[in-house]
């Protein structure tokens, strides 16, 4: 253990003790309710990886376990690759593929909005990754621009990340809780009944497509973007419009209209999206067949960490580090909710977490 690698930063209660024998710190790349994310370099081969550190103890909860188990099973070019988990004296470290291109969200913020062709280029990759997840019986449940990363290539490859809210129909029951970020949540999820997570993912993909094309969220009131109650009402009523200044093809409008359908039974499905004329236009050959993509993604690296080893590490990670105590307060991740949440605080049905994600009590 490299004691010189003891560090503390935002989003952490106690300093991280790195596994200095295997990875060396390059820099911090993010922080939030989960803890902190760091860019690290493998001492064995010099490869850059992203490492998500979560403090040992109570924070190693069901969401963390679900994220690791589901993420471990997924091997696809449009999904951030899970590598391994490591237990340090202070934290659980989740080692993942590093996407050097940053968030798709940042790219849109810089561009304002995308052309229809550019939006389609990224949407095709998003649907390819989501389709693969669903084929593995995993629904993501928190698809959003902030959870889609890009690699560093000239024509960036999109990478889905953050499986903390994902559910597997093999390992878990039908989704019932309301999770996700307000702007992306499907109507049936807000109704607090059992729902098909795969169809709910379709809605979230539609929100992502709309934001790429328009540069704004479809169901937010532009005058009151932080008014979540109004956003929720507009979602339930499917109240959206495409501004006059946004020029998109009739085929694109048709696809959006078939995604934004309140009744999940009549909403377009992922397989139907993949056969839609707008989606098929200029579709890269490597996105046409999931089986070919998966076979192309066989990696000659170290064998996958066994489930038994992972479960043992997770069990040990629930034991708090010796001498753990508050050094830093958590900093809010994502949306800044301080100003406009007073009216929601009094609602007994709502639990609005500081990350900007809404979880309805069941």
Curated annotation (Swiss-Prot):
Domain Protein kinase: 23-279
One GO cellular component, as annotated: cytosol
Record localization: Cytoplasm, Cytosol; Nucleus
Any Pfam family hit: Pkinase
Tissues in which the protein is found: Expressed in leaf blades, leaf sheaths and roots. Expressed in shoots and roots of young seedlings.
First-tier enzyme category under EC: transferase
InterPro entries for this protein: Kinase-like_dom_sf (IPR011009), Prot_kinase_dom (IPR000719), Protein_kinase_ATP_BS (IPR017441), Ser/Thr_kinase_AS (IPR008271)
Keyword Kinase found: yes
Residues annotated as transmembrane: none
Activity regulation, per record: Activated by hyperosmotic stress and abscisic acid (ABA).
Predominant localisation class: cytoplasm
PTM comment, free text: May be phosphorylated.
Family stated for the protein in its record: Belongs to the protein kinase superfamily. Ser/Thr protein kinase family.
Biological function: May play a role in signal transduction of hyperosmotic response. Together with PYL10, PP2C53 and SAPK8, may form an abscisic acid (ABA) signaling module involved in stress response. Together with PYL3 and PP2C50, may form an ABA signaling module involved in stress response.
Subunit (UniProt): Interacts with PP2C53. Interacts with PP2C50.
Name of this protein: Serine/threonine-protein kinase SAPK10
Organism for this UniProt entry: Oryza sativa subsp. japonica
Name of the encoding gene: SAPK10
